[in-house]
């Protein structure tokens, strides 16, 4: 079978459908909304399945999962320079700052309490985060 290649020129990428090697009974049964990669080349697949965060090594081997009961509708992942994760949940209207093993360090927003649309109060379907070089956090909201 001919591999699927996307892109052009120096930016060509080959699709590897079977790259993720999940344990028996585990599967991505919902959207993988975002991915991030830490300094050790571990891949964080933030998904809308039963195990919201699936951690894989660079070869796709399953390492662990976490976030069950914490996340409602995962949306964005940002790996910070200090190897922590900023995770947005647009269904729960929160941003969570977590360690790489899932310990929640900080929650921004009130879980399950959306603010009025366009009110400017955190949050109404927050989507992504970005950190400035001075460590200012920016959040896109819905």
How would you describe each model-predicted region?
Residues 1-142:
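Eukaryotic scaffold repeat domains enriched in small/polar residues
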């Amino acid at each position: 079978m001919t591999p699927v290649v996307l892109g052009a020129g120096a930016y060509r990428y080959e699709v590897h459908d079977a790259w993720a090697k999940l344990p028996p009974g585990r599967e991505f049964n919902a959207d993988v909304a975002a991915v991030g990669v830490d300094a050790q080349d571990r891949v964080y697949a933030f998904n809308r399945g039963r195990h919201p965060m699936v951690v894989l090594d660079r070869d796709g081997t399953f390492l662990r999962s976490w976030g069950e009961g914490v996340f409602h509708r995962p949306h964005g992942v940002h790996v910070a320079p200090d190897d922590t994760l900023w995770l947005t949940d647009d269904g729960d209207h929160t941003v969570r700052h977590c360690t790489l093993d899932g310990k929640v360090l900080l929650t921004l927003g009130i879980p399950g309490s959306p603010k009025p649309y366009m009110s400017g109060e955190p949050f109404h379907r927050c989507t992504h985060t970005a950190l400035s070089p001075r460590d200012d956090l920016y959040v896109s909201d819905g």
